[in-house]
Amino acid sequence: MMFKQYLQVTKPGIIFGNLISVIGGFLLASKGSIDYPLFIYTLVGVSLVVASGCVFNNFIDRDIDRKMERTKNRVLVKGLISPGVSLVYATLLGIAGFMLLWFGANPLACWLGVMGFVVYVGIYSLYMKRHSVYGTLIGSLSGAAPPVIGYCAVTGDFDSGAAILLAIFSLWQMPHSYAIAIFRLKDYQAANIPVLPVVKGISVAKNHITLYIIAFAVATLMLTLGGYAGYKYLVVAAAVSVWWLGMALRGYKVEDDKVWARKLFGFSIIAITALSIMMSVDFMVPNSQSLLTYVW
């Protein structure tokens, strides 16, 4: 029973979703030549770092989680794990994850993990989520870290391919998160969390969703235009982007925003999974200039 509680507090669904993107970035960079020990070290390392961040987030959010229907039964809210124990647990997970990335992958992968962790726990969870409508934007950077870590674990440098991945996954986070905020609007209002639909209204949020999906569509094309992914990837990227944009535009005519937002959220998961799969299997050898090389 205790194992289940310690697993739940790490948010395994979030870990699994991040692993899909890590695999996408790793295999894109590997280009068919897979270093399996490196692959395992990277997956486990990122999983532990994400788990650590989620436990810290649960610790920080336990007061507002009590006010939200979706989160009122979380482990820390119900007192099934003490706050002190959760902090020790989160710290140990983080140390293990960062050590695996440093020694099993490379220092750059580790530092990217540290940056993503600091943004999520230190900037987003501790401050921005509760105080700023821009919290979602800042949080999107940490959400985009895993595929970049996977990519840089292979390459050892931050090149234009890594930058494109950062853009794709950051831009994807925005409509994905705003959709959640719309169909969970009452929860966010009850907890006084200043997400865009609460502060500016659902109509403004719909405009932002549409614009971010357009930007996401452009970013996805850059992997092919930059010589990193092939035309099969391009076709899938274009198809999911057009469909997702169409769903967003239909939101201006719907009567039930909650139902629409839930569908938009559901398709966002399909879209990013499809892209992660396609970049894993339809890769190309790029001609690129390194933006940041870590020599060790």
Swiss-Prot record:
Pathway the protein acts in: Porphyrin-containing compound metabolism; heme O biosynthesis; heme O from protoheme: step 1/1
UniProt xrefs under Pfam families: UbiA
Regions of this protein lying in the Cytoplasmic compartment: 1-9, 57-78, 127-197, 248-268
Subcellular localization(s) per the UniProt record: Cell inner membrane
Enzyme Commission number(s) from the entry: 2.5.1.141
Catalytic activity: heme b + (2E,6E)-farnesyl diphosphate + H2O = Fe(II)-heme o + diphosphate
Name of this protein: Protoheme IX farnesyltransferase
Record gene name: cyoE
